[in-house]
Every structure is written in C-alpha cells, then in structure tokens.
C-alpha cells in the first residue's frame, strides 16, 4: 500500500469550511477578500467603500444629468494573525485524515473562529451610539425598539440589519412571550431551537464573544462633571473638569454631552484637576459648563448594518 502524506492544501480544504461554520461576526458584516498578497503583518491595504449616489427629481426640460462614479477607499492595517500551533509529535498518532480532523482540525478551527469573533467584537469601542442602561441586561421588546430607533435615526439601511447578544440577553429574550409564541405567525424556531430569529427588522444571534466593557474611574468629589472651556466644532479633544476630579477614562467609554453621544478613542487620566480625552465623532461647538454623563461598565451588545464594519483578509506568502 502506498504511503499518503497529508499536505497543507489538504489541511486547508478540511479546515476552512469548518472555520467558516464557526464564524459569527465576520459572516454578518462586509467582507473584503483579495488574491493580492500581503508581505507581512502590519501592511496597510486600501479597501473600497460602497459608491454613494444622490437621487433627484427628473426634469424633462433639463434632461438627464449624469452622476460621477467616485470610488473612495479607506486604509486598513492588517495587524492581526490568528494561529493555533501544535507540535508535529502531537499529530503523529493520527492514522488517517479523519483522525487528524477529529483530533486537530475541528478544535483548531473552533479556536481560530473564537479568536476572530473576539477581535471583531472589540470594534464596539468605536461605536458611539448607545441605548439602554449600562450594567442592566436587556430583557424586553423595548430593547429591540430602542435599537431600531437608533439605527433609523442614523439612516442605516433597513435591509440586512443584525444584532449580536450575549448569553444573558439571549436567555432573557427567548423567554419573552411574544417570541415564544411566534409559532402563531408560522414559525416554531424560537420554541424548538431557542432562537430569537428576526425581530423588528433585525436578524438576532447569540455570541459568547460579545465584550464586557469595564469603564474608567473618572469621578468628581461632588457636583457634576462638566465641559471645561469653549470648544470649536469639528474637534476631537474634549476637556472635562469637576470638583476634585480624579480617575481615568478608558478607550470605549461612552460620554453624553450637549445631546450627543461620543466614545473615548484613547485612554486618558486626570492631570491638574482636568482630563483631556480624544473622542469620536467630531464635537459640536461647546461654550463650556455643559453637564456630562458617563456610562458605567456594561456588556457591549451590538445592533448594526453589515456595512458598519468590514472583515478584511489577504493571503500571506509561503
């Protein structure tokens, strides 16, 4: 009987389908693949953004007015490589490809998927819109309604919306009567599979990779935390003050001020009674003295349109 040597291609053919089965977040967002090789970790590639058009009322007298097709790009740093490393001796006990699949490929694919899901879910730190109460697990239909309202206000396209919930929120939702009794509209999936399904225009999924955010310790000894001094519109540096202000702000902390929501983009600490933090999106004009609200530690469940995020990959040279 001829010897059979397992090659890298055979591993890939077996592992990739199993990896895709375990992926959650990347399968719900925009994906950018290319055959162009990346030479090394940290390379920057340009990813095309969808073309945006503006519609107008047709005027027969003016005739057709063509719109320019402008393709814009965004730079993405390929700064993450997920890997599962196993010594050759650990694979030598396998006597067939089926053994290799059971002992190594399937567990490795699951581990890689968990790593990729967790890295993707860390993007919550860049999301500034938020609803609900920090530290309180969403457990009513109002959570869906408020998330839908936030997406509508941001003019997110209606089709393709999705939501990822942590196990606690998922358990609370699957016990809701309107979801349990969804069989009245022809579906028994919620009852038999424990699946939330599509609610209020969003496809809902559970993921153990949903992140828990630990907020910074910024606090004032008494009174409110307020904006310190005037700020011009368009800036990203927000200065806060308060009575005997102490503590820190962490990347991903949520700040509400002047009717807007912002996320902290870099860690910051109090110095000389004030704290200067970088935020997104750009600030409006502030006169100073505006009251600031800080969200506490919370679970970062996500509701989004697929075009809000992108999963970008490139092959590495052998």
Name each model-derived stretch.
Residues 1-74, 78:
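N-terminal "assembly arms/tails" that initiate or stabilize quaternary assembly
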Residues 31-36, 133-142, 146, 231, ...:
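Surface-exposed ligand/attachment interfaces on beta-rich extracellular proteins
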Residues 47, 74-143, 152-168, 195-204:
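Long, contiguous amphipathic alpha-helices that act as assembly "spine/axial" helices in icosahedral shell
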Residues 49, 258-259, 296:
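Conserved "cap/hinge" positions at secondary-structure junctions
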Residues 55-58, 86, 96, 172-175, ...:
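Short helix/loop capping segments that flank catalytic or ligand/cofactor-binding pockets
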Residues 107-136, 217-224, 243, 301, ...:
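Signature of extracytoplasmic/envelope-associated structural regions
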Residues 172, 177-287:
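Autoprocessing Asn-cyclization modules and mimics
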Residues 274-318:
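Glycine- and charge-enriched low-complexity intrinsically disordered segments
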């Amino acid at each position: 009987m001829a010897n059979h040597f397992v090659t890298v291609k055979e591993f890939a053919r077996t592992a990739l389908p199993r990896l895709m089965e375990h992926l959650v977040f990347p399968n719900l967002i925009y994906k950018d693949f290319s055959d162009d090789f990346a030479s090394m970790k940290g390379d920057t590639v340009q990813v095309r953004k969808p073309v945006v058009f503006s519609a107008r009322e047709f005027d027969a007298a003016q005739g057709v007015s063509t719109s320019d097709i402008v393709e814009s790009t965004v730079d993405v740093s390929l700064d993450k490589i997920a890997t599962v490393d196993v010594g050759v001796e650990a694979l030598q006990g396998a006597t067939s490809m089926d053994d290799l699949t059971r002992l190594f490929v399937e567990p490795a694919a699951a581990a890689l998927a968990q790593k990729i899901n967790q890295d993707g879910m860390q993007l919550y730190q860049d999301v500034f819109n938020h609803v609900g109460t920090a530290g309180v697990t969403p457990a009513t239909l109002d959570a869906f309604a408020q998330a839908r309202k936030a997406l509508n206000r941001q003019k997110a396209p209606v089709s393709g919306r999705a939501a990822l919930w942590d196990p606690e929120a998922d358990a609370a939702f699957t016990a809701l009567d309107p979801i349990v009794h969804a069989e009245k509209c022809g579906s028994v999936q919620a009852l038999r599979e424990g699946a939330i399904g599509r609610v209020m225009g969003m496809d809902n999924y559970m993921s153990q990779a949903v992140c828990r955010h630990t907020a910074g310790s910024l606090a004032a000894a008494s009174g409110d935390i307020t904006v310190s001094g005037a700020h011009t519109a368009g800036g990203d540096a927000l200065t806060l003050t308060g009575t005997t202000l102490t503590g820190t702000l962490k990347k991903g902390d949520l700040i509400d001020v002047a009717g807007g929501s912002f996320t902290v983009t870099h860690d910051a600490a109090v110095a000389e009674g004030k704290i200067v933090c970088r935020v997104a999106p750009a600030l409006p004009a502030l006169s100073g003295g505006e009251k600031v609200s800080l969200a506490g530690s919370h679970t970062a469940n996500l509701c989004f349109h697929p075009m809000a995020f992108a999963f970008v990959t490139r092959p590495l040279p052998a």
